[in-house]
Amino acid sequence: MTGRRGHANVFMFCCARPTGVVESRLPDRAGGCGRIFEGTPEQLLASLERLAALPDDTLVYCAHEYTVSNLRFALAAEPGSAELGVRSDGAVRMQAAGIATVPTNIAIERATNPFLRCDQVGIRNTVATRLGRPPVSRIETFTELRAWKNQFA
C-alpha cells in the first residue's frame, strides 16, 4: 500500500443486500466523498455510481462523521438547493445535540450529495464558473469538485 497510512488503493463498499444496509469503507461520506490518495477519479466516481444505484431506502453507514462540513461544501457547490439547505440545517442541529448524522440513505445522498449530482445543472454551472468554461464531461465535473473540496475551508 502506498499513500497515506490507513487508506487503501481501492474504493470499496460492503453491501448486505438482504437487509438493505451498506457499510461504506472509503468512497462515501454523508453528503460528500473521500479524498483520492490512490486510484483515479474515474475509479472513485464508478464506485460512487454503484453505491447510488442501490435502492432508495438502503442505509449507508459511513466510516467517518464529516456530514456538517461536507454539507457546507455541498451548499457552496449547489447554493440554490432547498433540499440541501434543509438537510444541512438538520445536520447542524443533530451535531449540536450530540446525535450522529449517520446512517443516511441512498435517496438522501442522491438528492443532496454533490458528488452524486455531477450531471445536475446547478453543479455543472458552479464548476463552469470555477473552470472559466463548461466542464466537458461528468468526470471533469467530478474531478473539479473533488479538487475544490480538497481546498475548501
Show which residues each predicted segment covers:
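Accessory terminal helices/loops
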Residues: A46-L59, V68-A153
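Catalytic core of the metallo-beta-lactamase
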Residues: M1-E78, R146-K149
